[in-house]
């Protein structure tokens, strides 16, 4: 089998380059800046419900397509595999990678918090009542409930409610069922492939309004919380962003180098998705486009279909960093000394409470409450200290989660021998808009 890769639009792109104002990431970046200005100078306009609806509406438009895209991608990936062992092998390798990297992210948060001590000498006011709702939800998050929640009551309900893990479970079972039918399932496989292409077409239409969503989300955030919300806790925000930067550039950078690619070229390749996530504070808003780009990058459809959706529940690197860093910040702000043993307990508990958090509203804050409730309940009132700035840190959590899952997919594909090196080189090295890059594979 040989793969012939052709970048059919490379020449056209070079000679007829898009005007800069028509490039998506330029539009999104401009919308974010405009949103900050509107929210800062005219907060009453910024926090208007209609402005908020712009951001919420865009995220909902993306989310409406996530479940069918994941279902079709996973089913198609598994159904086209002739070897059952291969699916299990990919899943095991993905989970091993997730646990190792997640542990590193949690440990990095602990180390940075101990070295920089952003909560030491904190002077501020907290309102314990403000976090009562989050703490209540966290108390209901038990391991057995999480496992049972993966199994849907009905298949229709899983799709209707957008429960990613439930859809993923059904897709895996359905894919194996089609695999067992062999050639008799050819028509169904073709239908699933066609639906997947149609859904990606829907996303390509929806993503054109990303600048509107980014503007609305940013204008509302600044208008609602105000720039002064950043002032009092700038130390924690700066520490969190610094830690996430180190994790992506150094941690993921080393992993990427081992797998044979540059983290900087990879980040440039997914710049559109990063800006969409920055504007919406939701890593799920870029999931469909991310899956499509990873296939263009050379990852096999089966690896992309299994690793990326699973990573949104088991590989939340940004959330992991946030939980250990915020826990120590709260302890320092409340003058509570945590022993080494207690910090190791926090790491282990956070590893468990973070699983499946992506499907929960206010996931980072709720999992933080779950971790504190399990380790040091007396720290729960201190969550009110970070409540006001949690929104400003959610962007960084989402960006880090997206980067982590993208790198994870490429690494697992490389580990499994399912990474097309030539496609990887073409996609990362050519000065071509990735969305314009057509990759044709000819089997001979």
From Swiss-Prot:
Belongs to the dicarboxylate/amino acid:cation symporter (DAACS) (TC 2.A.23) family. Keywords: Cell inner membrane, Cell membrane, Membrane, Symport, Transmembrane, Transmembrane helix, Transport. GO terms for biological process: L-aspartate transmembrane transport. InterPro entries: C4_dicarb_transport, Na-dicarboxylate_symporter, Na-dicarboxylate_symporter_CS, Na:dicarbo_symporter_sf. It comes from the Bacteria. Responsible for the transport of dicarboxylates such as succinate, fumarate, and malate from the periplasm across the membrane. PANTHER family: AEROBIC C4-DICARBOXYLATE TRANSPORT PROTEIN, PROTON/GLUTAMATE-ASPARTATE SYMPORTER. One of its GO terms (molecular function) is fumarate transmembrane transporter activity. The gene is dctA2. It is a multi-pass membrane protein. This is C4-dicarboxylate transport protein 2. PROSITE patterns: NA_DICARBOXYL_SYMP_2. The chain crosses the membrane at residues 23-43, 61-81, 95-115, 162-182, 198-218, 236-256. Coiled coil: none annotated. It comes from Bradyrhizobium diazoefficiens (strain JCM 10833 / BCRC 13528 / IAM 13628 / NBRC 14792 / USDA 110). It is found in: Cell inner membrane. One of its GO terms (cellular component) is plasma membrane. Its main location: membrane.
